[in-house]
């Protein structure tokens, strides 16, 4: 019962979390480039 429910919860979580992590890494890269 857990296996079919897991992707239903995991896919939207990754869909929201992945762009957030990408934005954070991009912001840190811009900030680091600005310091240099």
Swiss-Prot record:
Transmembrane domains' residue ranges: 10-30
Entry annotated with the keyword Transmembrane helix: yes
This protein's record includes keyword Transmembrane: yes
Keyword line: Chloroplast, Membrane, Photosynthesis, Photosystem I, Plastid, Thylakoid, Transmembrane, Transmembrane helix
Record's signal peptide: none
GO cellular component, one term: photosystem I
Membrane topology: Single-pass membrane protein
Any one GO biological process: photosynthesis
Intracellular or extracellular location(s): Plastid, Chloroplast thylakoid membrane
NCBIfam families, alphabetized: PS_I_psaI
Entry's family note: Belongs to the PsaI family.
Function: May help in the organization of the PsaL subunit.
HAMAP family xrefs: PSI_PsaI
Annotated protein name in UniProt: Photosystem I reaction center subunit VIII
Source species taxonomy: Eukaryota, Viridiplantae, Streptophyta, Embryophyta, Tracheophyta
């Amino acid at each position: 019962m857990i296996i079919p429910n897991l992707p239903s919860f995991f896919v939207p979580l990754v869909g929201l979390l992945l762009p957030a992590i990408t934005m954070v890494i991009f912001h840190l890269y811009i900030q680091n480039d600005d310091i240099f």
